[in-house]
Amino acid sequence: MDLSVELFGIRFKNPVWVASGTFGYGVEAAEIYDISKLGAVVTKGLSLKERLGNETPRIVETPCGMLNSIGLQNPGVEKFLKEIYPKIKDVDTHFIANVFGETEEEYVEVCMALEDADKIVAYELNVSCPNVKKGGILFGHDPVILGNLVDRIKAKIKKPLLVKLSPNVTDVTEFAKVCIENGADGLVLINTLMGMKINIWKRKPDLATKTGGLSGPAILPIAVRMIYQVYEKFGDRIPIIGVGGITTWEDAMEHVMAGASAVQVGTANFYEPLAPLKVIEGIENFMKSQNIKDFKELIGIAHRVE
């Protein structure tokens, strides 16, 4: 049985990754289990300089999920390379750096700082960030701005570039198209949905920033729908990485059958640290029960079965 997938010229031992912002940089999780069993680790977001994040409270539970407004807290790319990277560089799995910035220049600088870090095999762009030079509009909410960002980064880097698309748009396929046209190597669907929770006793929003990103089981059907739509239009042109609402192997298989070549387990890591391993095991058992020898047979199969 073959669970491996080759994406953007890189072979992954299995299609189960962990999502950015839910796994730190892999150091803490490595004390709980052997993270080399994972297909890949996507790091917590990295910016050029250290960020302290938003005021608290910045996490609140909701039915079937959670809202977060962490504010992209991170040590900055140089401190990451100096203090954290040495602890992960010998782990036998791939690491993908989640990267963000407030300007095109910052995105480019962060990626360039990581070009010589061999353990980092690709970049995942978080484009749900405000462009301070364009009046604060999110990079991922304007197709022209997004296309320019992808084009500018691709011109400078050698490693594959994945773009994590926002679901908070009218037509996600429009944004997928501009990423493809400007050289993106992969698409990650989806980022969190904007939401709010109000404390009726305090008469105000629970989060200090009022709104936050909704993740967890509640967003599974939305992620599956968007993956299906993008695969339907562009599945033969670019690989899709599915993320959003994956708690079990069954959830992961919905992503895969909709068109994802690999999946990321996110929020589930907070309450079940072994969730990614259980997803891997579940996919293996499913393939055995269905007499499927190669995982790749399942990618996008929902488009081929009537």
Swiss-Prot record:
Pathway: Pyrimidine metabolism; UMP biosynthesis via de novo pathway. One of its GO terms (biological process) is 'de novo' pyrimidine nucleobase biosynthetic process. InterPro entries: Aldolase_TIM, DHO_dehydrogenase, DHOD_1B, Dihydroorotate_DH_1, Dihydroorotate_DH_1_2, Dihydroorotate_DH_cat, Dihydroorotate_DH_CS, Dihydroorotate_DH_I. GO terms for molecular function: dihydroorotate dehydrogenase (fumarate) activity; dihydroorotate dehydrogenase activity. Binds 1 FMN per subunit. Transmembrane segments: none annotated. It comes from Aquifex aeolicus (strain VF5). Its main location: cytoplasm. Substrate binds at K44, N68, S69, I70, G71, L72, N126, N191, T192. This is Putative dihydroorotate dehydrogenase A (fumarate). It holds the Pfam family DHO_dh. FMN binds at S20, K44, G45, N98, N126, K164, I190, G216, G244, G245, G266, T267. GO terms for cellular component: cytoplasm.
